[in-house]
From Swiss-Prot:
Pfam families, per the entry: TruB_C_2, TruB_N
Protein name per the record: tRNA pseudouridine synthase B
Residue ranges constituting the RPE1 insert domain according to the UniProt record: 262-307
Its biological purpose: Responsible for synthesis of pseudouridine from uracil-55 in the psi GC loop of transfer RNAs.
Annotated source species: Rickettsia felis (strain ATCC VR-1525 / URRWXCal2) (Rickettsia azadi)
Record gene name: truB
Catalytic-site annotation from UniProt: 40 (nucleophile)
Length: 339
C-alpha cells in the first residue's frame, strides 16, 4: 500500500469527515485515510489528509502551527459563533477602524479560551454540538492556546466587518477568538468567513481542490501526493544499520554508537529543535564544529549522553520509525511498514 500525504482544500458546506469519505471512495475502501484537524462545515481551506502509514504521523500535524484568515461581523452574536447560527444578542456599538487594528496586540501570546458549545469536543462521550443542537447547556473547560501573530487586514465601516490574519497553536477556535476580539472592543461579533491557509508545511497555493469525486481519479491524487517524510524535514534523523533496523522492527530498544552517530547528528546540531531538546553531559574530549550559517565555533562533548525528545530513524532511505533518544537508547513511538 502506498503511503503519502494529500494537501486537500476543503470547500464550504462539506464536513471534514465527508471529504475523507470522498477520497476513500476514490482510492478504495481498503485504503486507510485520516485528516489532520477538523475544519468547520462553514469553513474552507487546508485539510491535510494522511494515506496509509502516514496516518501514524497525524498527531504531528495536529500539533503544528496553523494560519487562518477570518472576517468578523460586529454588533451581533450567534449561538454557534458563525453565520450559520441563530442570532441571540445584538449591540449598537461598532468599533472604529483604529480600535479594530489596535486590539490585536492584546491577544498575541499565551491565551485562555473556552471552546464554543458548537464544537466536536466530547462531553461525557457525546459531541458538544449535538447537545447544543438539542438545546442542552454545554459547559466546556478553558484551554490554553498560543496566538503567535494576529493582525487586521481590512476594516469595512459600512458593513461593520473586519478581516484578520492569525498564526496560532493547536486547539485554537477562531469563532471564540472572533467573539473575544469583539468583546474586548465593547461589542459583539461572529465569523462570517473563515479560511485556513496553512497547516505545518501544507499551504493553499498548491492544494488539491475537489468538487466532485467523479472529477478526480486515483492516479491524479497519487501524482499530487507528498512523500510521507515531508513533515519530518525539521526533525533529527538517524540511519539504522541492518541489526538496528531489525531490533526496531521487533519493538526492541536500540542502542546507537555515540562516537559515530553523534557525528551524524551534529549535522543538525544547530537547528533550534536540537538545542531545545538536548541534554549534554560533561566530557573531557570535545568535538569542535563550525556552523556554516553563522561562522560560530562550538565545542561539544564527544562522549555524550544525548537525549532528544523526537527524532526519526531511516533504513535504506525509507522511514522506519519515530521515537525518542534517551541517553544511549532509541525508544520507538511508531514503527512504519514501508520496506
Amino acid at each position: 500500500m502506498n503511503s503519502y500525504w494529500l494537501n486537500i482544500y476543503k470547500p464550504r458546506g462539506i464536513s471534514s469527515a465527508k471529504l475523507v469519505s470522498m477520497v476513500k471512495k476514490i482510492l478504495g475502501k481498503e485504503v486507510k485515510v485520516g485528516h489532520a484537524g477538523t475544519l468547520d462545515v462553514e469553513a474552507e481551506g487546508i485539510l491535510p489528509l494522511a494515506v496509509g502509514e502516514a496516518t501514524k504521523l497525524i498527531q504531528l500535524l495536529i500539533d503544528a502551527k496553523k494560519t487562518y484568515i477570518f472576517t468578523v461581523k460586529f454588533g451581533t452574536k450567534t449561538d454557534s459563533g458563525d453565520y450559520a447560527g441563530t442570532v441571540i444578542a445584538t449591540k449598537d456599538y461598532i468599533p472604529s477602524q483604529e480600535e479594530a487594528y489596535n486590539v490585536c496586540s492584546k491577544f498575541i501570546g499565551n491565551v485562555t479560551q473556552i471552546p464554543p458549545a458548537f464544537s466536536a469536543l466530547k462531553v461525557n462521550g457525546v459531541r458538544a454540538y449535538k447537545l447544543a443542537r438539542e438545546g442542552k447547556e454545554v459547559e466546556l473547560k478553558p484551554r490554553n492556546i498560543t496566538i503567535y501573530n494576529l493582525k487586521c487586514l481590512n476594516f469595512d465601516e459600512k458593513n461593520a466587518t473586519a478581516s484578520y490574519y492569525t498564526e496560532c497553536s493547536k486547539g485554537t477556535y477562531i469563532r471564540t477568538l472572533a467573539e473575544d476580539l469583539a468583546l474586548s472592543l465593547q461589542s459583539l461579533g461572529f465569523v462570517i468567513e473563515l479560511r485556513r491557509t496553512q497547516v505545518g508545511i501544507f499551504k493553499e497555493e498548491n492544494a488539491i481542490r475537489i468538487k466532485s469525486p467523479d472529477e478526480i481519479t486515483k492516479n491524479f491524487l497519487e501524482e499530487k501526493s507528498i512523500k510521507i517524510e515531508a513533515i519530518l524535514d525539521d526533525i533529527l534523523v538517524l540511519d539504522a544499520t541492518d541489526s538496528q533496523a531489525q531490533q526496531i522492527k521487533y519493538g526492541q530498544k536500540c542502542l546507537f554508537n555515540y562516537e559515530e552517530d553523534f557525528r551524524r547528528l551534529s549535522k543538525f546540531a544547530y537547528r533550534e529543535e536540537f538545542e531545545e531538546n538536548t541534554e549534554r553531559s560533561t566530557a573531557a574530549y570535545t568535538l569542535v564544529r563550525e556552523d556554516a550559517n553563522t561562522g560560530l565555533t562550538y565545542k561539544l562533548p564527544l562522549e555524550v549522553e544525548l537525549s532528544v525528545s523526537l527524532l526519526w530513524v531511516r533504513y535504506k532511505g525509507n522511514l522506519l520509525a519515530i521515537g525518542s533518544l534517551n541517553k544511549s537508547c532509541f525508544n520507538s513511538l511508531r514503527v512504519f511498514n514501508l520496506l
